Swiss-Prot record:
Gene Ontology molecular-function annotations: 3'-5' exonuclease activity; DNA binding; DNA-directed DNA polymerase activity
Family label: Belongs to the beta sliding clamp family.
CDD domains for this protein: beta_clamp
Subcellular location: Cytoplasm
Organism: Spiroplasma citri
UniProt GO BP: DNA strand elongation involved in DNA replication
Statement: the UniProt record of this protein carries the keyword Cytoplasm: yes
Keyword terms of this UniProt record: Cytoplasm, DNA replication, DNA-binding, DNA-directed DNA polymerase, Nucleotidyltransferase, Transferase
Listed name of the protein: Beta sliding clamp
Keyword Glycosyltransferase: no
Known function: Confers DNA tethering and processivity to DNA polymerases and other proteins. Acts as a clamp, forming a ring around DNA (a reaction catalyzed by the clamp-loading complex) which diffuses in an ATP-independent manner freely and bidirectionally along dsDNA. Initially characterized for its ability to contact the catalytic subunit of DNA polymerase III (Pol III), a complex, multichain enzyme responsible for most of the replicative synthesis in bacteria; Pol III exhibits 3'-5' exonuclease proofreading activity.
Subunit text: Forms a ring-shaped head-to-tail homodimer around DNA which binds and tethers DNA polymerases and other proteins to the DNA. The DNA replisome complex has a single clamp-loading complex (3 tau and 1 each of delta, delta', psi and chi subunits) which binds 3 Pol III cores (1 core on the leading strand and 2 on the lagging strand) each with a beta sliding clamp dimer. Additional proteins in the replisome are other copies of gamma, psi and chi, Ssb, DNA helicase and RNA primase.
Classification lineage: Bacteria, Bacillati, Mycoplasmatota, Mollicutes, Entomoplasmatales
GO cellular component term of the entry, any: DNA polymerase III complex
Gene name for this UniProt entry: dnaN
InterPro entries, sorted: DNA_clamp_sf, DNA_polIII_beta, DNA_polIII_beta_C, DNA_polIII_beta_N
Amino acid sequence: MIVNIKRDKILDELLKVSRIISQKTLIPSLLGILIEVKKDKITFTTSDGDTSIKSEIMGNDLNITRIGSVLIKNKFIVEVIRKIEDEFITLEVVEGNLIKIKANNFDSVLNTLNSADYPHLSFETEGKEIIFTSTVLKEIISQTSFAIGEKEKRIVFNGLNIKTDQNNKELIITATDSFRLSCKKIDYSNNYNFDVIIPGKFINEIGRLISENDQVSELLLIIINCKQKIIEGKYPDTSKVIRTSFNTSLTINNRAIIKIIERRSVLSNETMTTIVTLKIKEQKVLVTSFTQEIGNTEEEIRDFKVEGTDQIIAFNSKYILDALKAFKTKEITIKMIDERKPLIITANDDQTLQQLVLPIRSY
């Protein structure tokens, strides 16, 4: 195997695929990156046993002299290439089990792993497919993934639910950890029906991997055919918890309410839970906060529109901030029933997104 390749390009791909490598794996070969040089491209494959990633480089960024493959620990090759400053480098397998990395006035030889021990990972699929642009996929992930549970006893809450609604020609994306819920809807014109739960870890990794210029295709196609990637189980019908009638609605500049709540939380840390209370009384709106270690703070909201009855509702500041930041609109509307029922956040300028946050009993 001999290939001459742009240093920046290979380093970028190595860093992308190496993110999922787990140092806790019991399979030694999974500590490595499988590099395969073919007739017109070079591929990089990694896996943690559950999630697998394959990336390719082709075109003018490389010149292939001899095809072949090599398995090498990711840390070694990444650190060596990171130190090289030349525009191009050459990778060459020598003596069967060594890889030589060459550049101007630089030569390094590294030990390799046995590539024959690497598990066979098939990325070929024959199932249903759905195509997202990277822009849409990144928006879906940023607006929903924060609500995915991490170590929930109900394992289905540890993933992102994606299902079709053929009646409304929509794709419904839902995440919840049982304390908050995020629901995103996008237009969907295919006749394929599916209802899958994708692990949160995989969703977040996809979000980090894709770039704005990529066309992300066949995401569900790949996952559906790799059964271990799917969380088995039936996702609950969350439409039943999203109410359509409310007693009070508060419309406000989104950035303004975010800043107010952030000021209420500025002295807290990850070990503290800041309880933020929204008080609506006689066309006056106050935001107060309380932490056991610090005490109380209060701020009055100036510009807003409120309709309905007075309310006093307390909630976790992190949960409400995550929900508000998911919206890219100028204004949002917070809809409330009472201090015990979930509040719903929507936006007139984005009918595709709803956020739900459960209140906290502050007494």
